[in-house]
Amino acid sequence: MFKAAINAELLKDAVAALAVIVDEVRFKINPEGISVKAVDPANVAMGIFELGSSAFDEYNADECEIGVDLNKITDLLGIADKNDTVRMELEEENHKLLIDVGGLSYTLSLLDPSTIRAEPRVPQLELPAKVVLNGADLRRAVKAAEKISDHMLMGVSDDTFYMEAKGDTDQVRLEMGRDQLIDLKAGEACSLFSLDYLTDIVKPTNKVNEVTLSLGKDFPILIDFEIANGSGRISYLLAPRIESD
């Protein structure tokens, strides 16, 4: 059993944060909320998503798992006004999700969860450096880097966090000292990442006051931030691009 009501803009932002990784997901539902762990087809990026029951205006659920096509949900929410309420109810026997929004009623066919890639195992990484910054600053640096290159270097040197992109003739670099950051735990960190992935991953951070980056040397980066006014969280784990000598 699953029956819930939630603000349309909040749900739209949550779905968008997941959709940058995969098109189809397994929603694990229980009385405490909804969670997803998913990895992209190339095994480069992983998303870990949690949306607590407190994010909803109404929430009543037993433990269950449903398969969802995120593109269909995105299209459906595209016609909703930001202040609309989205009401959802699961029809378990028919494998349908009933959705009411903006006076319109939808019957969404669900996917068989067994046909969707199983939850990945989340690796336990010791990442020595941690940077906390405003989401808009991260988005700005990535946007600038896109114009120069297809990858970006991110690292920590002494008390400075830097993001750098180099093209054939041009380069761009943003440095942020401890006093410009919300928090900094210095450590050896310098890794190269694909902007094809970073560009999509940082899109949801534009509305976020605090984004935490955990880094190492030639290690994956963990990008972590709250959603739904603190009632949810999403973490992205992005593998580095290793340059051969």
Swiss-Prot record:
Belongs to the PCNA family. Disulfide bonds: none annotated. GO terms for biological process: leading strand elongation; regulation of DNA replication. Homotrimer. The subunits circularize to form a toroid; DNA passes through its center. Replication factor C (RFC) is required to load the toroid on the DNA. Transmembrane segments: none annotated. This is DNA polymerase sliding clamp. InterPro entries: DNA_clamp_sf, Pr_cel_nuc_antig, Pr_cel_nuc_antig_C, Pr_cel_nuc_antig_CS, Pr_cel_nuc_antig_N. Pfam families: PCNA_C, PCNA_N. The lineage of its organism: Archaea, Methanobacteriati, Methanobacteriota, Stenosarchaea group, Methanomicrobia.
